[in-house]
Amino acid sequence: MTRIRRGNIARRRRTKIRLFASSFRGAHSRLTRTITQQKIRALVSSHRDRDKQKRNFRRLWITRINAVIREIGVSYSYSRLIHALYKKQVLLNRKILAQIAISNKNCLYMISNEIIKEVDWKESTGII
């Protein structure tokens, strides 16, 4: 069996991997075997953290909305507000509500009061 020379193909593959790991420190950017291991590890972490980021932002939005509601000092909670929005079929998601809460607290106060009043009135009269 003859020997296969893979100089060009292997070099191209290694340089492509090295370009990915050029910003890594120490042997992680110089040794081929550790570069491949670190590349796999980096890609796994980035994939995992993309899902984590979605969770973290949702938690942040909920915290911001809840903080503004408590600061205003109204008699209802975050969960009641979200339930009322759902019942009323208002298309304001948590991200938009959090932006409104930061930029204009009075606007959020007016929105929440209107929605809570209508839902409470319908529940008390037995319409829902």
Swiss-Prot record:
GO terms for biological process: ribosomal large subunit assembly; translation. One of its GO terms (cellular component) is chloroplast. SUPFAM superfamilies: Ribosomal protein L20. The keyword Oxidoreductase does not apply. GO terms for molecular function: rRNA binding; structural constituent of ribosome. Keywords: Chloroplast, Plastid, Ribonucleoprotein, Ribosomal protein, RNA-binding, rRNA-binding. PROSITE patterns: RIBOSOMAL_L20. It is found in: Plastid, Chloroplast. Pfam families: Ribosomal_L20. Its main location: plastid. The keyword Plastid applies. Belongs to the bacterial ribosomal protein bL20 family. NCBIfam families: rplT_bact. Binds directly to 23S ribosomal RNA and is necessary for the in vitro assembly process of the 50S ribosomal subunit. It is not involved in the protein synthesizing functions of that subunit. This is Large ribosomal subunit protein bL20c.
